[in-house]
């Protein structure tokens, strides 16, 4: 299990990709691509727009409050435990399995926010990751060599337990 020490959490306040203020603005970027969502609101917005993420990673909360708007989930559902501020081996294994079970929702008991990092390694080049940036909008990241390098660098700030 990787744990992000509290003193390094500031590194994750900046978006990991391009920020859009409205979900409709990202539609041209995900058309015809494998795309994954991390977070309840962004997953809800994708499903409400009639789009089914290849992998949706949710925890039932938004801004630490229960999120009750989720439309009916389609596809396989995997349940994992991933405490806040961590990336567990269980989460990574579920994300890998989810690639073989598309469409799939990974329901996290704990927190899903950091799932973006392992997804950069698991997804193929050209896939897109969408996640919410509180008070800013929606972040879109296209998986490529540079994104993987950025994720790998951020992972150096974690400690292994």
Swiss-Prot record:
One GO-annotated biological process of the protein: coenzyme A biosynthetic process
Molecular-function GO terms, alphabetical: GTP binding; kinase activity
Catalytic reaction equation(s): 3'-dephospho-CoA + GTP = GDP + CoA + H(+)
Annotated positions binding GTP: 40-42, 59, 112, 135
Pathway(s): Cofactor biosynthesis; coenzyme A biosynthesis
Pfam families for the chain: DUF359 (PF04019)
Record key words, sorted: Coenzyme A biosynthesis, GTP-binding, Kinase, Nucleotide-binding, Transferase
EC number of this enzyme: 2.7.1.237
Family: Belongs to the GTP-dependent DPCK family.
Function: Catalyzes the GTP-dependent phosphorylation of the 3'-hydroxyl group of dephosphocoenzyme A to form coenzyme A (CoA).
HAMAP family: Dephospho_CoA_kinase_GTP_dep
Name of the protein: GTP-dependent dephospho-CoA kinase
